[in-house]
């Protein structure tokens, strides 16, 4: 990726993003079918938005070191759509793993298995000792910056992080919050919108996936 994230500069990447989207979509279907549990609708309908956010350069993050202090933050407000994040990380990490094996270039070297989510980890989705069914900021998913689950749960946290960053003089750090339209029914969502406007949280980006699935 270059520093230019205009549409014209990124257009050549779109074909690869589309292939990545297809891989993530198929993985979501596979792990939910394998486990016979989970939330497919909201997980699949957010794939495009998440990939564009992660790959376009609009969000500053490092897949190898997501805990970097001044990296942008991701809050999955709709925590039940966590298969989206698991499968996205699995695809991107596998690409880096293959690239490192081919080149030996340290830029593609990932941390150990305790910090990296691989294809095989997906088999443990919603199983004891495996990947949990809702978003958790831990271990292999330090990309996430809050533990979420119920509708609207992560909205106040996202706004709080954005406010704290501004008050700490780090207003250049952006907070990206992903939610579905059903999550807007919670009172907390409306309170967050009003608060974000009143507090001028221009570092909070609230991405609403209007999928009409509801769950």
What is the predicted function of each stretch?
Residues 1-18:
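Non-catalytic, mobile gating and regulatory segments of ester bond hydrolases
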Residues 17, 28, 34, 44-199:
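Cofactor-binding active-site loop characterized by glycine-rich and histidine/acidic residues
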Residues 21-37, 209:
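N-terminal capping segment at the start of a domain
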Residues 22-23, 41, 45:
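N-terminal glycine-rich anion-binding loops that anchor highly charged ligand groups
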Residues 40-41, 75, 207:
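A structural signal for short, well-ordered beta-strand segments and their strand-loop junctions
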Residues 177-178, 206-209:
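Residue-level marker for buried hydrophobic side chains located in beta-strands
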Residues 210-215:
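Long, well-ordered, tryptophan-enriched scaffold segments
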